[in-house]
Amino acid sequence: TEKYRGILGDAVDYVTVEHIDKDLKALGHKIDLWHTTDQLFIARRHAKGMINLLTVHDLNFLHEKKGIHRIKNLLKLKWFIKRSDCITVISEYVKQDLLKHVNIGKKPLRVIYNGIQDTTKEAQRQPDFVNVNDKFFFTIGQTRKKKNFHLLIPMMKYFPEYKLFICGKRRTSYYRELKEIKEHCHVDNVEMVGEITNEERNWMYAHSEAFLFPSRLEGFGLPVLEAMRYNCKVFSSQCTSLPEICKNHATYFDSFEPEKMAKTIKEGLAEWDKNGELALAAKEYSMSYNYDKYMKQYIELYKELLHSLN
């Protein structure tokens, strides 16, 4: 349906349909391989002689949900895997998490990292909420508790000369919680600015003093790599997939205690030069996550799976 348009990025062409089974049958073609590119997607096909490939992005529900909701999501994933012939995951972390909680039997399981669109040559626009002389830190993501944005608010007491802009949806309970924490901490240099456009996001990456990402649950960690492409210093948690994705191109928080987080940032910024070797190395590393490599790996896998039909 139209609501999924753009979900895989701007580099993909989209065809909007309302009734996938009906529309696919109308094409009159035999489908040899069906790739469900996200375990959350509703669109699925099963037929005799058809190979089913499933991509699992994360098992975050195991850590976010409780009781019957947790069990329901796990059973659903197990059922999808049972009906799949091959599984891909987006990081080694997700692979190990999957193997820990789901018996996949002898089904092939492969890690294929996400490709990332290069936006560095795309349009940029300074957001209205940023003043000309502002020195600022930046973070962006789903406004959910797993992102740990609340840890950054008391830390900003140690950076009176900087602002922190938290970008993400306003209509969540966690957003309201962030506002309450800000009021309780009496911090006036933190702004929750809501969602921003792609052009504004690009500008923020390019002009931020640092990108802060204390998330505790990630299957991959797209924003950290996006930030690196703009020579932006990245500070990250050591949770889940982030050390695997950032490697030595980020500085990691050893503690979530505000003063220690601030110390980590100050030390990291002291050795950072946007045009220096560390920044250029991080950018080059980030560029290795591209759609050419991503598509090449999937095309090779498609050929391998289709060859097994013959």
Protein language model annotation of sequence segments:
Residues T1-N310:
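Carbohydrate transferase catalytic cores enriched for Leloir-type hexosyltransferases
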